[in-house]
Amino acid sequence: GEFVSLSIDKIEVADKRGRQTKVADMHLRRVHEANVEKRDNGDVVILNIPMVDQGPKGYCVPATFERCMRYMEIPADMYLLAMAGNTGMGGGTVISTLVNAVQQEVWVAGRTLNTLNGFPTFKELEKYLKDGVPILWGMHSTQWFNDTANRRTSMRKASQPDMWRKIIEKADQKLEDLSSPQRGENLHICIIHGFNKTTQEIAFTDSWGPRFTERWISAKEAEHFSSGRCWVIEY
């Protein structure tokens, strides 16, 4: 399908004919560091990532990229990104095509889009998230994964970190008996935006509306369901 996007801007913005004004790195770093919330239970979570609800259209990839781009002060629109990625109604995006389009927009804004092959180590996750930089995560959003994430997110609220860590360790041991997702099974992209070092968990957010702003899963489970690629927009 074709989409029409109408943008109403101030005269001085329109006069620039779409050229972006780069937000200074130092200013953006301070803003992002201020977005990092450190909780008493050891959770470290990035707040204020814009929510974009993909709705029933299956636009998880363009919606998720829009969220991260807007968080990095880069103008973005889910529908325009969907066209760039040849996204059809109901989903299905040519990732490489979309990434190339995003790279251009990110570069114009003075940022860099880096591809991370494989799932990052916990230390790598910490490095980005502590600085307030979220990670786009390619993964398999299976029924088992979502049921587990929903249950854990609810249960962990009433548990002490040390006790909860033992529960997570037992759960991680059962991964050996869990088959790996098939290559094209339930492919999805969401955003990793938090971690807990004591419990070795990660927080992630989906482009499905406010109810999916923050969910939790163990880092080992996240690696198990990873589709092998992540992306980070850096300064």
Predicted regions and their residues:
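Surface-exposed beta-strand edges and their flanking turn/coil or helix-capping segments
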Residues: 21, 64, 75, 149-152, ...
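Active-site-adjacent structural segments surrounding the nucleophilic cysteine of cysteine proteases
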Residues: 1-108, 183
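Noncatalytic regulatory segments and standalone regulatory/sensor domains
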Residues: 5-33, 156, 162-235
